[in-house]
């Protein structure tokens, strides 16, 4: 089991109630972080973190692992995490 830090921004802070949360996960994969967040916060996170069709991170979200865009990492959601890694989640934002 490893511990990772998840930092959330914008509207996700309202859902989670804080800027960051420490998670202990058994399977040290990025996908496990999203599963644990879903287990804790469920349908309060909208849109869902995982796209139901592609099984990848919903394209509306930006997800960084240790400051690197998940979309540019070779294993994406199946990438291995290590103790102390930092995952950052940015929800969709609109502006004009």
What are these regions (language model features)?
Residues 1-95:
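Ubiquitin-like/PB1-type beta-grasp interaction modules and other compact soluble beta-rich domains
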């Amino acid at each position: 089991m490893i511990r990772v830090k998840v930092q959330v921004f914008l509207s996700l802070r309202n859902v989670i109630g804080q800027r960051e949360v420490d998670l202990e996960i058994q399977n040290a994969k990025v996908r496990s972080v999203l599963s644990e967040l879903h287990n804790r916060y469920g349908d309060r996170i909208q849109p869902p973190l995982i796209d139901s069709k592609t099984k990848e991170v919903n394209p509306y979200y930006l997800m960084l692992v240790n400051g690197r865009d998940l979309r540019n990492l070779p294993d994406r959601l199946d990438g291995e995490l290590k103790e102390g890694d930092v995952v950052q989640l940015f929800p969709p934002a609109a502006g004009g």
